[in-house]
Regions:
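Signature of multi-pass transmembrane helix bundles
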Residues: 1-54, 163-294, 311-313, 385-409
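Generic hydrophobic alpha-helical membrane-segment signal
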Residues: 2, 91, 98-100, 135-140, ...
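Short glycine/serine/threonine-biased micro-segments
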Residues: 12, 59, 68, 108, ...
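Membrane-embedded alpha-helical segments and adjacent helix-loop junctions characteristic
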Residues: 29-128, 257-346
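Hydrophobic alpha-helical segments, principally membrane-spanning helices and signal/leader peptides
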Residues: 36-39, 46, 95-97, 132-140, ...
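Generic signal for short, ordered secondary-structure residues
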Residues: 101, 105, 140, 231-234, ...
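C-terminal transmembrane helix pair
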Residues: 114-115, 122-161, 167-197, 323-409
């Protein structure tokens, strides 16, 4: 329901602003730009879905091999104590826990191409447990919030952009991103847990969160001992070694059980195209709405309004120049990336705004895109509290990013 209101608001607000521009300022370009954005956004949505087809086909095939070989079930048993607490509505030992783990792991390593197909597989498995096929279940929402909060341990792509833009130390945003994304994820889990009345103060969850904190601290310490080139090399190498190990491990596990690995892969891969096609209408809907909102100038007005309010309250407005990235990130990953690059081009890669825009880019994820793709793949229309929890996690990430960047830079 929330997504429905937001979608309507994108169009209505954009239309009203365009009317005002035409009436009061004689701007005859607003409506053509909005209409052009509908065509370009529709094309982009289809191209994204088309681009996902090959990757979906590959990873759905790999997942089927893992299922046949028992590797996914083994992961499920290993993670049962944690997932029983975090996803109480999922039966203990269900294969979906393995898919969830692999999706979260791929996201943490910055492997988006692997994470999305694994996430869609997890959604399909959770849908089999859903009695109301058009309504999101509690596990679906918790899983989606884990994705939208954008927990990332190795932000390789952002460091590459900083290097290309001439940053003296492209890796100097690594620790701030790690801390900001940790706060956004923790907030997402807590808020969703409150909505779903999940007891997070139990021994298993406290030990798990403590272990994650220790892992984050160890990674921060390890990478802080490296120079920028070593850091980029090691992070990329580790991420891809782990990913390739998963693929080979699944294949060997299936071969050990005398499974016809090739046939199992083909069986799973057949679902790739149909899944990509199911996503198209949902993706077109959200990207077109975002495109119209941005083309109308509403986004620029929102940012200028925030800057005026902060200045009126006597606050420091240094961070406002990076807000376009923060505001765009829940709406469009490519749009936020463009805002980040624009901020580094305008203010400099090593400026406060340039660095903060990079931390914004890494601290949250594309909430509405994820909702459109993940829920769209299984035909979910009623999202319940998914949007609220996802946006609160995003807000926590933005606030944490601002505070941390003031501390670091």
């Amino acid at each position: 329901m929330v997504l429905n209101y937001i979608w309507i608001a994108f169009f209505v607000v954009a239309f009203v602003i365009a009317i005002c521009k035409l009436e009061f300022w004689g701007d005859v370009e607003a409506f053509p730009e909005m209409m052009n954005s509908t065509f370009s956004s529709s094309k982009t949505a289809f191209e994204i879905s088309l681009g996902l087809t090959g990757v979906l086909t590959l990873w759905l095939g790999i997942m089927r091999v893992g299922e046949k070989g028992g590797a996914v079930n083994a992961l499920s048993r290993l993670l049962s104590p944690v997932f029983v607490k975090l996803f109480p509505d999922i039966p203990k030992g269900h294969p979906v826990t393995g898919s969830i783990f692999m999706n979260v792991a791929a996201n943490m390593l910055g492997l988006d191409n692997a994470a999305t197909p694994l996430g869609l597989k997890a959604m399909e498995q959770m849908q089999t447990l859903n009695n109301k096929k058009d309504t999101a279940t509690n596990p679906m929402i918790m899983f989606l919030v884990l994705n939208t909060s954008g927990l990332t341990l190795i932000p390789v792509s952002i460091m590459v952009y900083r290097a290309q833009m001439g940053a003296a130390q492209p890796t100097d945003i690594f620790v701030p991103i790690l801390l900001a994304t940790f706060f956004s994820t923790l907030t997402g889990i807590i808020v969703t847990g409150i909505y779903q009345r999940i007891n997070l103060l139990n021994r298993v969850m406290l030990l798990t969160l403590g272990g994650i904190c220790a892992l984050v601290a160890a990674i921060i310490w390890g990478f802080s001992q490296m120079d920028k080139e070593s850091m980029n090399t090691v992070s990329t190498l580790v991420a891809n070694i782990l990913l390739m190990t998963i693929i080979v491990g699944f294949i060997l596990a299936a071969a050990r059980k005398r499974v016809n690995v090739y046939d199992a892969f083909i069986e799973g891969a057949k679902d790739g195209f149909s899944t990509a096609v199911r996503i198209i209408p949902y993706l077109v809907a959200i990207l077109v709405a975002i495109g119209v909102f941005r083309a109308s100038g509403a986004m620029d007005m929102l940012i200028d309004g925030v800057k005026y309010m902060v200045a009126a309250l006597g606050g420091d407005t240094d961070f406002v120049g990076a807000l376009p990235t923060a505001l765009m990130k829940p709406l469009s990953g490519s749009g936020a990336r463009g805002m980040m690059v624009d901020a580094m081009t305008t203010y400099g890669a090593d400026s406060f705004i340039g660095r903060l825009s990079c931390v914004f880019q890494g601290s949250t994820d594309t909430t509405f895109y994820i909702i459109a793709v993940y829920f769209g793949s299984v035909g979910i229309r009623h999202t319940r509290h998914a949007v609220t929890c996802g946006l609160l996690a995003d807000l926590a990430g933005v606030i944490a990013a601002i505070a941390i960047c003031y501390l670091f830079f």
